[in-house]
Amino acid sequence: MALVTCHRDDAILGQSTNISEFKDEWEDLQREIDHYNTIIKWDEMWDIETAKRWLKRGDRLFLFKQENKIQGWIWVFTTKEFRHLYVNPQYRNVKNARDLISTAGYIVSKNWAKWWAHIDDWNLGAWWVARGIGWKKVIDFHDN
């Protein structure tokens, strides 16, 4: 696992028309969560109740949409952590992942100078995307 950070002065920020902040789209969010759970088995996957708690405490959810349907997301927590990046496999590519991260970064950069994330060792694709838009690796750490 690696700790990565991004400073707004180093970031490649953008605004994609396919990215928006969550606005009470609970039914569509549940649909994509259900799809996620059929293709990925992950113990830390959140559900609607967790999403409601996170949003209530001030965390933000940014959505990737295609054909007016949620097809991906990234959470940005009040701790300045970017977390839970996901793009539906049908739409998974560097551009869509980059758009999610850079659009969320653009929005939070208005209030924050720096933000961070963890990237798992197996997720080299996420690291390539993040590095390509200005994120820097701070430290690698491993379980063993």
Predicted regions and their residues:
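Acyl-donor-binding surface of acyltransferase catalytic domains
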Residues: 1-23, 127, 139-144
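Short amphipathic alpha-helix that is part of the acyltransferase structural core
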Residues: 12-46
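A conserved beta-strand-loop-helix scaffold within acyl/acetyltransferase catalytic domains
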Residues: 42-89
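Catalytic phosphate/metal-binding cores of nucleic-acid and nucleotide-processing enzymes, i.e., regions
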Residues: 79, 112, 138-143
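Conserved acetyl-CoA-binding loop-helix of GNAT-fold acetyltransferases
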Residues: 87, 93-106, 127-128, 132
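Glycine-/small-residue-rich active-site loops that bind phosphorylated ligands and cofactors
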Residues: 92-93, 122
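Conserved GNAT acetyl-CoA-binding A-motif
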Residues: 108-120
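Conserved active-site alpha-helix within GNAT-family acetyltransferase domains
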Residues: 121-139
